[in-house]
Amino acid sequence: MDALIGDLQERIKASGLPVDLIVVSDHGMIAFKDRNFVALDKMVDLQGVPEVGDHLYPETEAEKEKIYEELKVKDDPRFAVYRLKDVPAQLHYDGNAREGDPVVEPLEAVPVTVHANSAETRSKGDHGWDPQLMPDMKAIFYAEGPDVKPGVKVGTFENVNLYDFVAGLLGLKVGKNDGDKKVLQPVRR
């Protein structure tokens, strides 16, 4: 990856164009600490419950509440369970129905799957954990170019703050979002 980015930097320089280059990841990765995965269908009856990936989409409010209560009572230290409306603000779910309900948040480096026979259980690692709980989930951020101050270092920040930064570099009007434009302001020339 380093060689590819280096090649891109050289090509940008050779072009003579005023290009700002931003290298960012949406998340980190973490190796599973063990194979003691959480299989939701071994904890609660999910027969007939629509799901996509590790998201559950019960069709009625009663089903959502029943699954939530059954998972909550397990009091398993490997995960937290929330109703969608109660997900902690730092996770930026904002009640979006695409997230499913209830929401299961891993608290340890173990896979959380809907089905015990999921391909996920054969994986060696994954992403999706809260970076405040698991530092390996933190993303990378590098920026350089004519609109970026060289040598400026910023601390860890949430990716929701990138929107204002990139829109500003492009001269675009910024819409309402969860980011804080002050976070990356020190990087701008």
Regions found by a protein language model. Name each.
Residues D2, D26, N161:
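Acidic active-site catalytic centers that drive phospho-/nucleotidyl reactions
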Residues M1-L21, K66, V166:
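A long, amphipathic alpha-helix that forms part
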Residues E51-K153, F157-G168:
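Active-site neighborhoods of enzymes that stabilize oxyanions during catalysis
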Residues V23, R35, K85, N177-D180:
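Short loop/turn and capping residues at structural boundaries
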Residues Q9-V19, P77-Y82, L172-D178:
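Surface-exposed helix-capping loop/turn segments at secondary-structure junctions
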Residues P18-L21, S25-E59:
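Acidic/histidine-rich catalytic neighborhood
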